[in-house]
Amino acid sequence: MSSLDNTMKFTVPKEANTADVQETLTEVYKALQEKGYNPITQIVGYLLSGDPAFIPRHNNARSLIGKLERDKIIEELVTVYLSERK
């Protein structure tokens, strides 16, 4: 059996808590809006690529989002999305 047949378990480090992720995303969202960007597409671009250029320095947004692991942000987004769909 090849390793492609086995399911790998992914664990996210417990560095940031839910409030940190929510607060950071809210601040980044506001900064993107203020600069005239589409916040959703810019955040998605950042999460998919890891390129901080998707997030402006305005209101320290780039620094704020850079303090969080992208996998932790994605985990929080999926958790909230699925909990609202139950």
UniProtKB/Swiss-Prot annotation:
UniProt superkingdom: Bacteria
Membrane spanning stretches: none
Residues annotated as signal peptide: none
InterPro entries: IreB (IPR009309)
NCBIfam families per the UniProt record, alphabetical: PRK05473.1 (NF003997)
Stated family: Belongs to the UPF0297 family.
Record protein name field: UPF0297 protein BBR47_19030
Highest classification ranks of the organism: Bacteria, Bacillati, Bacillota, Bacilli, Bacillales
